[in-house]
A protein has these predicted regions:
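Hydrophobic residues in well-ordered beta-strands that form the structural core
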Residues: 197, 218, 276-278, 422-424
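N-terminal basic, amphipathic alpha-helical segments
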Residues: 1-130, 332, 336-342, 372, ...
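Conserved core segment of the aminotransferase class I/II
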Residues: 124, 298-368
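Conserved core of the PLP fold type I
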Residues: 138-272, 284-299, 303, 461-463
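Conserved PLP-binding active-site segment of the aspartate aminotransferase-like
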Residues: 37, 42, 323, 399-405, ...
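Short loop segments at secondary-structure junctions
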Residues: 73-75, 308, 323-327, 356, ...
């Protein structure tokens, strides 16, 4: 059984999350200590102590004889302050900023993209030269509401090769994969709704869902997909509206969804009326196709999203949503309301690049390089006592456990001082249960200095 201090902190974390997501708003009375204790299956004294500590933090007010109430409002979009107080080193926003703001001298084994030299630069340059000769409409006009017709037709054909039957009219282009998820959240969610995510999952899911002020529940992940018993229990306990996942190459673990888990997952989702968002941005890194929930479901309750930032260029902001027609229509209206016409140039360049005769060969080369980099990273990490959760079939990520329960956040802070940006496990974990894990990007982990700095940080952590 967990220590009482841990139980108190868990109650506080749950209440902070509800306040941050606007599931409970300023002025609302919280459940009585007895009712809260029964709901959370803890003692009354644990809830009393948690409530009193939250009063001391200024999140609650106590009214003698009446109960405990939510205090003043959460500042609009103060994302770093929303939710439980966490070490800044495991805050998803902080981790993203360290990777995005660092200069070329900083090594980034914790980032989520390929080195610039691995991207399809030659194809992008050819596309830009071709576009420079295009007529004025291509260079100056807004895109149509759903986006470039040619790119949507291409995506419909590509989806068909994955077993997903979608017409071009069911495809909506967006400015990025992140915008695609943001639009879906705006379309389907209200503040206070519950969303399921994998635990661990891509850390920007946490940041984005904070912005939508929803209640997030993590479901433990396995090498074959989500733990279905835990998933079923979460459906019963929380009545979630949405589940966001990667079914191809999972971020951060590199795991692949098994067909058996996919079928059982969809049955559970159908019974609960759950909508699934399938983030498929790593599809081009696969060496053999993984099952797709959207293929099994036929885009009935599954929405698939993707982008081209991982393989073509991160500077070309272009993604997509594939959904059933009624939803695509509503999402298109929402895109106009929030983004108006969208970009045309990016879609033109992306289409030209990915239909270029060299793109397929380029990706074959990238997949080979990733396999070599994966083998090298596993070997180098093993010399430091760092072990992978699994060795993935494909992709760029290794989800690794540090030796002797070392604190990944402390190791990341130490490495940052020496110009190495890492991604600590709890940035990915809704339950904060990955404190001794790091995610490594093998394509960004080829420099020997990374492992020298990491060895030094681990040694310091052991002495500490």
């Amino acid at each position: 059984m967990a220590r009482k201090g841990t139980r108190i902190e868990a109650v506080m974390s749950e209440i902070r999350s509800r306040i941050a997501s606007r599931a409970v708003v300023p002025g609302v009375r919280l459940p009585s200590v007895r009712a809260q204790a029964e709901a959370l299956r803890v003692s009354v004294s644990t809830v009393v102590e948690a409530y009193e500590r939250l009063v001391a933090e200024g999140l609650l007010t106590s009214r003698p004889g009446s109960g405990f109430y939510v205090a003043g409002p959460v500042a609009p979009l103060a994302l770093a302050e929303m939710g439980p107080k966490v070490d800044r080193a495991v805050d998803p926003l902080w981790v993203s900023r360290q990777s995005l703001e660092s200069d070329a001298r900083v090594l980034k084994p914790g980032c989520g993209w390929l080195p610039a030299s691995w991207m399809y630069e030659a194809g992008v340059r050819r596309a830009l030269r071709s576009l420079a000769r295009a007529d004025t409409v291509e260079l100056a006009e807004y895109a149509t509401p759903q986006g470039h017709p040619g790119l949507r037709q291409f995506l419909a054909r590509r989806l068909a090769t994955a077993g997903i039957d979608a017409s071009p009219e069911q495809v909506l282009l967006t400015e990025s994969g992140t915008q695609a998820i943001d639009l879906v959240c705006r379309f389907l969610l209200e503040p206070g709704d519950t969303v399921l995510v994998d635990d661990p999952c891509y850390f920007n899911f946490h940041a984005l869902l904070k912005a939508h002020r929803v209640h997030v529940v993590g479901v433990p992940n396995t090498p074959q997909g989500p733990d279905l018993d835990a998933f079923d229990a979460a459906l019963a306990a929380h009545a979630p509206r949405l589940y966001i996942t990667n079914s191809g190459i999972h971020n951060p673990t590199g795991a692949v969804l098994s067909p058996l888990v996919a079928h059982r997952l969809l049955k559970l989702a159908d019974r609960a009326g759950l909508v699934i968002v399938e983030d498929d941005i790593f599809a081009d890194f696969e060496t053999s196709p993984a099952p797709r929930l959207a293929a099994f479901d036929g885009l009935s309750r599954v929405i698939q999203i993707g982008s081209f930032s991982k393989t073509v260029s991160a500077s070309l902001r272009c993604g997509y949503i594939a959904a059933k027609p009624a939803w695509t229509d509503g999402l298109t209206d929402l895109k106009i309301a929030t983004n108006f016409g969208g970009g045309r140039l990016g879609a033109e360049v992306v289409l030209s690049a990915i239909t270029d005769s060299g793109y397929r060969k380029h990706m074959e080369t990238v997949r080979v390089r990733l396999t070599e980099a994966m083998d090298q990273a596993v070997h180098r990490l093993a010399t430091l006592g760092i072990t992978p959760w699994i060795v993935p079939q494909a992709g760029m990520f290794l989800w690794c456990r540090l030796p002797d329960g070392a604190d990944a956040a402390a190791v990341a802070r130490a490495c940052l001082q020496d110009g190495v940006v890492l991604a600590p496990g709890n940035a990915f974990s809704q339950s904060a249960s990955a404190g001794d894990y790091l995610r490594f990007n093998v394509a960004q982990s080829r420099e020997a200095r990374i492992f020298e700095v990491l060895a030094k940080a681990l040694s310091t952590a052991e002495r500490g």
